[in-house]
Amino acid sequence: MRLTVVGANGRMGRELITAIQRRKDVELCAVLVRKGSSFVDKDASILIGSDFLGVRITDDPESAFSNTEGILDFSQPQASVLYANYAAQKSLIHIIGTTGFSKTEEAQIADFAKYTTIVKSGNMSLGVNLLANLVKRAAKALDDDFDIEIYEMHHANKVDSPSGTALLLGQAAAEGRNIMLKNVSVNGRSGHTGKREKGTIGFACSRGGTVIGDHSITFAGENERIVLSHIAQERSIFANGALKAALWAKNHENGLYSMLDVLGLNE
């Protein structure tokens, strides 16, 4: 399967290029970077410190998408919406690992998915998506006598909060209790907040160092707690998940899917 990596000079872009080179069922077709990048016209090998790859880096989306079957996208929300538009026009598979979308941007991507196959997830790893499945089941089994609190930590350069993964876990918990996350979420607490409101889902976030991603969700009841957690040790888990999603999407109809669909975990 021929694939284009966008945002290729970022952390995940480089991981995706590396992951593609390790496999025989996918091929690096093109590499896209931001306009005016110093990497333009150089070989993609410069991004991962490998031998010559024979793929020229470009800042032109038309060129990057002209001979590809799919787009691997861990970029920025505005850019992802633009790429989703290209994907819809050219019937390209679009794998989106970008986080931090506004409600308007989410709606735009959902609209583009009517015309192509899009897999979008706040986390592409098998472990996190299995965790989300367990969280949903636990939330369904435990009533609101068990308070739900989600904690996440990421590297110092992460710009959105809570993380896409934390929101994915929160959404799973809300679905388990048949409630709307936006109506019950509490993002951080500071000062005199008063008593915790029953039925809410709390989020706490930390940023520092080079942490790839730590997530835990606590169900706190009377005299007992259930804690489910996931620790990401390498970004390669997200890259491998994205490739799995691309190959899966190749055989599925137009629509907006998640990694839960890819992994057969969506109930």
Swiss-Prot record:
**Could you tell me what this protein does?**
Catalyzes the conversion of 4-hydroxy-tetrahydrodipicolinate (HTPA) to tetrahydrodipicolinate.
What is the protein name given in its UniProt record?
Answer: 4-hydroxy-tetrahydrodipicolinate reductase
Q: Which reaction does it catalyse?
A: (S)-2,3,4,5-tetrahydrodipicolinate + NAD(+) + H2O = (2S,4S)-4-hydroxy-2,3,4,5-tetrahydrodipicolinate + NADH + H(+); (S)-2,3,4,5-tetrahydrodipicolinate + NADP(+) + H2O = (2S,4S)-4-hydroxy-2,3,4,5-tetrahydrodipicolinate + NADPH + H(+)
User: Gene name?
Assistant: dapB
Keyword set for this entry? Answer: Amino-acid biosynthesis, Cytoplasm, Diaminopimelate biosynthesis, Lysine biosynthesis, NAD, NADP, Oxidoreductase
Q: In which pathway does it act?
A: Amino-acid biosynthesis; L-lysine biosynthesis via DAP pathway; (S)-tetrahydrodipicolinate from L-aspartate: step 4/4
Q: What are the subcellular locations of this protein?
A: Cytoplasm
**PANTHER family, per database record:** 4-HYDROXY-TETRAHYDRODIPICOLINATE REDUCTASE 1, CHLOROPLASTIC-RELATED, DIHYDRODIPICOLINATE REDUCTASE
UniProt cross-references to InterPro entries, sorted A to Z: DapB_C, DapB_N, DapB_N_CS, DHDPR_bac, NAD(P)-bd_dom_sf
